Regions:
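Compact nucleic-acid interaction/catalytic patches
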Residues: 30, 34, 45-83
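Short N-terminal edge-element motif at the start of the domain
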Residues: 1-36, 42
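C-terminal terminal-subdomain/extension
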Residues: 74-170
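Low-complexity, polar-biased intrinsically disordered regions enriched in Pro/Ser/Thr/Gly
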Residues: 15-32, 63-76, 97-109
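Short loop/turn segments at secondary-structure transitions that flank enzyme active sites
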Residues: 10, 47-49, 56-58, 89-95
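Alpha-helix initiation/capping motif
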Residues: 6-7, 49, 150
Length: 170
């Protein structure tokens, strides 16, 4: 498991795909003014499809997230992993984020702390990913399902993207 940047074109494709099939999309934006959002993964695999969860600055505890806390400073929450917004990503559409190549020193330090948290909690993260996936796909809690990506729809979009976009590029 590692930090990755997800291809913007693919992310936008999933947003359009989910909106077309569901009427709304919960696929998070990854483009921000100062830097693009990145993801941690693969947090789980379903039918050979790897899922990645965004690392977010959101700092409120919710059922579908894990707060990222800095070791030795439990009160300082650095962000969260928001599992209701995890997405399936083909290997061709991710690029490993090399922390030591990040130029902004403060941001690089934050990334190192977040990465260490994720690695120290990898098993917990994988369990949470599987639990939220199961809860959403079986509609165990309507409010959670409504506020989550439609994982099965995204899996279909993932397959269609590979078939219609990636195969034609090769």
């Amino acid at each position: 498991m590692d930090f990755y940047r997800i291809n913007e074109e693919y992310n936008q494709y999933l947003q359009r795909y989910e909106k077309e099939k569901r009427g709304v999309t919960k696929v998070p934006n990854i483009r921000y003014t100062d830097r693009n959002k990145f993801a941690f993964g693969a947090v789980m695999q379903v039918n050979g499809i790897n899922y990645y969860v965004s690392v977010s600055s959101f700092d409120k505890k919710q059922e579908a997230n894990i707060l990222i806390r800095v070791p030795g400073d439990e009160k300082e929450i650095k962000g969260s992993l928001r599992f209701n917004y995890m997405i399936p990503v083909p290997e061709a559409c991710i690029e490993r984020l090399v922390i030591k190549e990040v130029e902004d020193g403060k941001y690089r330090l934050l990334l190192n702390k977040e990465y260490q948290f994720c690695m120290d909690n990898a098993e917990r993260i994988q369990k949470k990913a599987n639990k939220i996936y199961e809860m959403v796909t079986t509609n165990r809690k309507q409010k959670l399902t409504d506020n989550s990506c439609a994982f099965r729809i995204l899996e279909q979009g993932y397959r269609e993207y590979i078939e219609n976009v990636l195969r034609t590029k090769c």
